[in-house]
Amino acid sequence: MDSNFIFGIGAFTAIVLVLAVVILIAKSKLVDSGDITISINDDPSKAITLPAGGKLLGALASKGIFVSSACGGGGSCGQCRVKVKSGGGEILPTELSHISKKEAKEGWRLSCQVNVKSSMDVELPEEVFGVKKWECTVISNDNKATFIKELKLAIPEGEEVPFRAGGYIQIEAEPHTVAYKDFDIPEEYHEDWDKFNLWRYVSKVDEHIIRAYSMASYPEEKGIIMLNVRIATPPPRNPNVPPGQMSSYIWSLKPGDKVTISGPFGEFFAKDTDAEMVFIGGGAGMAPMRSHIFDQLKRLHSKRKISFWYGARSKREMFYVEDFDQLQAENPNFTWHVALSDPLPEDNWDGYTGFIHNVLYENYLKNHEAPEDCEYYMCGPPVMNAAVIKMLEDLGVEHENILLDDFGG
């Protein structure tokens, strides 16, 4: 046999062996294996040990430590921020839209993006350790508007969710398939569903998902959690976009069904001051508005001046009307106002019309002695939020007095 041929085979074999060794070494460095320890808040009693692999958000959850993640770990909400002191690797490009360069230098990361490859040292907010999971039972799931349901859940007997008004919970769903044609929707709301043929949609989810929803209930409504959930249907101009996964799941729920939630979470809390409170809402942004206003007037018996400005398309989209009318009758410091952007002829509407930010300005803030001294709490569709914020900035309101809940619209 030719010596050059034999030499070539030998050289090739040697190269393959060297590459195999390099790959094995790299694998030992880069690929998850073995158990690792996550030290938490410099407290040995809080440290957890678990197999390497996955993301930090999931690793913590597997040990009963639930960090807020409105998007369910997709990296889009920026809520799951933790400080990683060591062991987290370099910050990823997907995190930089939520974390500034200064924060990155301080160790802030999105826990849903941090790979658990080696032992690490992290710092978590203390309130995280008060977060729990509950398996709840659906009490009711009724339409309050064309695209909004009120989901009412019973907490297990003897348990309570120690939340503050304006807080939120996370709701979970296992893989499932939901057909819109099976939704229970009263006849009065069928017009738009028929118009856009929404009954044709099917939501198929192949993985476990988590989403956040603001609570409509307030702390003295014991034993229940109440949500206002807007169905995320595909936009009319792009009907082939998949429908919202979690909202479709929630709309399919029926009394007696079991639902897993975790919480409480939140930062959209009322300030403890005597300043006037102006609440501005639209759509499913009603949820935290109801929670806050009921808490102020029914639990705290607040004497602060409070007004609520809510935007809807037509009378069919108005809800909790009797509740707010009663609060207004019982509390001289509270008024509430609705503006319809597209009232129907049969509405016979003689109230405010137009967009809520314009109505609020023209009919109240324009002639207010000191709008910059009020506190503004808002939750609604992104377009509404942006319009209200610009209007308030033009009036000289400082950012610290503009409080926004991004979840409810």
UniProtKB/Swiss-Prot annotation:
Subcellular location, principal: membrane
Transmembrane regions: 5-25
Cofactor(s) needed by this chain: [2Fe-2S] cluster; FAD
A GO-annotated cellular component: plasma membrane
Membrane topology, record value: Single-pass membrane protein
Any matching Pfam family: FAD_binding_6
Cofactor note: Binds 1 [2Fe-2S] cluster.
Location(s), subcellular: Cell inner membrane
Gene Ontology molecular-function annotations: 2 iron, 2 sulfur cluster binding; electron transfer activity; metal ion binding; oxidoreductase activity, acting on NAD(P)H, quinone or similar compound as acceptor
Enzyme Commission numbers on file: 7.2.1.1
Alphabetical UniProt keywords: 2Fe-2S, Cell inner membrane, Cell membrane, FAD, Flavoprotein, Ion transport, Iron, Iron-sulfur, Membrane, Metal-binding, NAD, Sodium, Sodium transport, Translocase, Transmembrane, Transmembrane helix, Transport, Ubiquinone
Annotated GO biological process: sodium ion transport
PROSITE patterns reported for this sequence: 2FE2S_FER_2, FAD_FR
Residues annotated as domain 2Fe-2S ferredoxin-type: 34-128
Annotated positions binding [2Fe-2S] cluster: C71, C77, C80, C112
FAD-binding FR-type domain segment(s): 131-271
PANTHER family cross-referenced by the UniProt entry: NA(+)-TRANSLOCATING NADH-QUINONE REDUCTASE SUBUNIT (PTHR43644), NAD(P)H-FLAVIN REDUCTASE (PTHR43644:SF1)
Subunit text: Composed of six subunits; NqrA, NqrB, NqrC, NqrD, NqrE and NqrF.
Family to which this protein belongs: Belongs to the NqrF family.
Function: NQR complex catalyzes the reduction of ubiquinone-1 to ubiquinol by two successive reactions, coupled with the transport of Na(+) ions from the cytoplasm to the periplasm. The first step is catalyzed by NqrF, which accepts electrons from NADH and reduces ubiquinone-1 to ubisemiquinone by a one-electron transfer pathway.
Name used for this protein in its record: Na(+)-translocating NADH-quinone reductase subunit F
Originating organism: Actinobacillus succinogenes (strain ATCC 55618 / DSM 22257 / CCUG 43843 / 130Z)
